[in-house]
Amino acid sequence: MASRDDLVYMAKLAEQAERFDEMVDHMKAVAQQPKELSVEERNLLSVAYKNVIGSRRASWRVISSIEGKDTVSDQLPLIRDYKSKIETELTDICADILKIIEAELIPNSTSEEGKVFYYKMKGDYHRYLAEFQSADERKTSASDALDAYQLASDHANQDLPPTHPIRLGLALNFSVFYYEILNSPDRACGLAKAAFDDAIAELDTLSEESYKDSTLIIMQLLRDNLTLWTSDQGEAEEAPGNADGTVVEDL
């Protein structure tokens, strides 16, 4: 069996080769060991799953768009079967990482930063499920995402400074959840604006350059979303149903 160091090294190689399914396998093996993940290992795990889920989320959006434009075609059953296949892959990936988060990562985490990171991650993957589910399944995933994001926020607000990249990334994704899943633009804008304003107030206290760069990048994403969402609200008031904003989230 490969050593922990070898698994991490192979995950880095897989990342460079853009073989993210293999990167997931390596980091999953690391995560299932009893020792708490280091910051580097935690980030590698996140990048691996983010890429395997991200490509399929993008595929699902493309196929859903085609399905919406081709409602009377003879090929519609083929389109729907293909979309269903992608949804199965999305479900399996989300179930896989959520099991690891619940069974290994949260119980083994000893730092508040780690807990915020993993609860945020839990919220993210329940949100990804809610993106394509319907009826009761969507309601359950949305509720689970909300609970996880709220727990992450409770820990972050108590233990991380407003300029911390993980706290800002949480605010970014939590606000996207309010906007996209709960259809609550006011809550989304309020959360994003509060996070941005709180970070601005303490920006001068940052010293470490790499930390500052990450903070500024996420703050820009928050501001981009605020600009987009407020614009969408104005357009929706003028022409209901025509707003089609694309939101951004952290990497």
Swiss-Prot record:
PANTHER family: 14-3-3 PROTEIN. Belongs to the 14-3-3 family. PROSITE patterns: 1433_1 (PS00796). This is 14-3-3-like protein. InterPro entries: 14-3-3 (IPR000308), 14-3-3_CS (IPR023409), 14-3-3_dom_sf (IPR036815), 14-3-3_domain (IPR023410). SUPFAM superfamilies: 14-3-3 protein. It comes from the Eukaryota. Pfam families: 14-3-3 (PF00244).
